[in-house]
């Protein structure tokens, strides 16, 4: 039985360009070598590698980035995720790989600060997800309505329409 390893290094940052515009990112790289063991009995493959624990070495990456604009009432986000098929983080925080996802978010919040209703928000989001073979895996649009009232109670209504998948 040969020892394996999984080393992950990363960096993150938040850049403020003006009162309203910000860019943030997280970037991780991993360097992995599998143990040699018969724990997994599978012929499946990812990229050029087997799922079996046969001592292969591979490197992967993960990127999260957001360009955002926030004013008193408006919030805009453009987000991009990119997790390579070879990325591994054995801590369990990242539970999927082989994906690229871009999303667009726009929201409006009215701070009424009345006795019963403190805040009303209306927002929408579009998300497109695909894998490293450029197969679309998810495409959806969502709408949100949120009302915040006394004693920090919140009502949230969410509607999602998925263009590729149906869960009925």
Segments the model singles out, each with a brief description of its role:
Residues 14-17, 23-168:
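Exposed, low-structure sequence patches enriched in small/polar residues
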Residues 1-7:
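A conserved hydrophobic secondary-structure block that centers on an alpha-helix together
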């Amino acid at each position: 039985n040969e020892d394996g390893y999984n080393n992950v290094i990363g960096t993150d940052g938040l850049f403020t360009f003006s009162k309203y515009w910000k860019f943030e990112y997280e970037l991780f790289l991993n360097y992995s070598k599998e143990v040699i063991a018969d724990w997994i009995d599978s012929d499946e493959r990812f990229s050029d590698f087997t799922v079996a624990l046969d001592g292969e070495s591979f490197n992967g990456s993960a990127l999260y980035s957001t360009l955002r604009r926030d004013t008193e009432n408006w919030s805009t986000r453009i987000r991009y995720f990119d997790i390579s098929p070879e990325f591994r983080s054995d801590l369990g925080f990242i539970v999927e790989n082989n994906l690229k996802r871009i999303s667009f978010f726009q929201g409006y919040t009215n701070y009424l600060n009345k006795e019963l209703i403190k805040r009303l928000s209306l927002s929408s989001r579009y998300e497109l997800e695909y894998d490293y073979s450029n197969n679309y895996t998810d495409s959806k649009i969502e709408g949100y309505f949120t009302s915040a009232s006394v004693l920090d109670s919140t009502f949230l209504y969410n509607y999602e329409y998925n263009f590729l998948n149906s869960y009925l």
